[in-house]
Amino acid sequence: MKLRWFAFLIVLLAGCSSKHDYTNPPWNAKVPVQRAMQWMPISQKAGAAWGVDPQLITAIIAIESGGNPNAVSKSNAIGLMQLKASTSGRDVYRRMGWSGEPTTSELKNPERNISMGAAYLNILETGPLAGIEDPKVLQYALVVSYANGAGALLRTFSSDRKKAISKINDLDADEFLDHVARNHPAPQAPRYIYKLEQALDAM
């Protein structure tokens, strides 16, 4: 009986630890970052226009597309920053005062894609994530929200946005990452933060 309980405990602990092992498999950022860096002049221009760190833009390009402007995902996310026309693309169009959504050819255009990606990061920062005080925590919140939606992130803290932001402001960057790893419904959420750090270190 004791042996059976011990075996169960080992399995339970293994399950808990594997849930948070978002660094496996390891991700080598060197080549994706090198390819993403070729777009740095555009990233700097878009970053200046929208108040977004061009290194953050470059890291997202490395993670999302590996620097390939023609990349198209199974979910129809398109281009360097893997934007979806019907969601993030439509949000950017609305911010610009335009109707409709971007075309596939527009999203495959490096300058337009990076500009819209930077605009979307600005929408997240000044909208649902407004009020986050720690710059590193904000950076982590931005990439998790960029990949999986701001609502999914905030709901792991509270259904009330203001309360969620207040709880986020009680955490430092490491505590925020741990919270995401333990509570976010998308397994790729903490892994995105891991990849972000790998990409920034490779620049």
Curated annotation (Swiss-Prot):
Q: Which gene encodes it?
A: emtA
Example of a GO biological process term: peptidoglycan metabolic process
Q: What is its EC number?
A: 4.2.2.n2
Topology term for the membrane: Lipid-anchor
Q: Where is the lipid attached (S-diacylglycerol cysteine)?
A: C16
- What PANTHER family does this protein's entry cite? ENDO-TYPE MEMBRANE-BOUND LYTIC MUREIN TRANSGLYCOSYLASE A (PTHR37423:SF4), SOLUBLE LYTIC MUREIN TRANSGLYCOSYLASE-RELATED (PTHR37423)
On the tree of life, the source organism's domain of life is Bacteria
> Which organism does this record belong to?
Escherichia coli (strain 55989 / EAEC)
Its taxonomic placement starts with: Bacteria, Pseudomonadati, Pseudomonadota, Gammaproteobacteria, Enterobacterales
UniProt-recorded Gene Ontology molecular function terms? lytic endotransglycosylase activity
Q: What does the function comment of this entry state?
A: Murein-degrading enzyme. May play a role in recycling of muropeptides during cell elongation and/or cell division. Preferentially cleaves at a distance of more than two disaccharide units from the ends of the glycan chain.
Keywords, comma-separated and alphabetical = Cell outer membrane, Cell wall biogenesis/degradation, Lipoprotein, Lyase, Membrane, Palmitate, Signal
What is the annotated signal peptide range for this record? 1-15
| Major subcellular site | membrane
Q: What is this protein called?
A: Endo-type membrane-bound lytic murein transglycosylase A
Top class in the EC scheme = lyase
State the reactions this protein catalyses. Endolytic cleavage of the (1->4)-beta-glycosidic linkage between N-acetylmuramic acid (MurNAc) and N-acetylglucosamine (GlcNAc) residues in peptidoglycan with concomitant formation of a 1,6-anhydrobond in the MurNAc residue
Subcellular localization is given as:
Cell outer membrane
Annotated lipid attachment (N-palmitoyl cysteine): C16
Family affiliation: Belongs to the transglycosylase Slt family.
The entry's cellular-component GO terms read: cell outer membrane
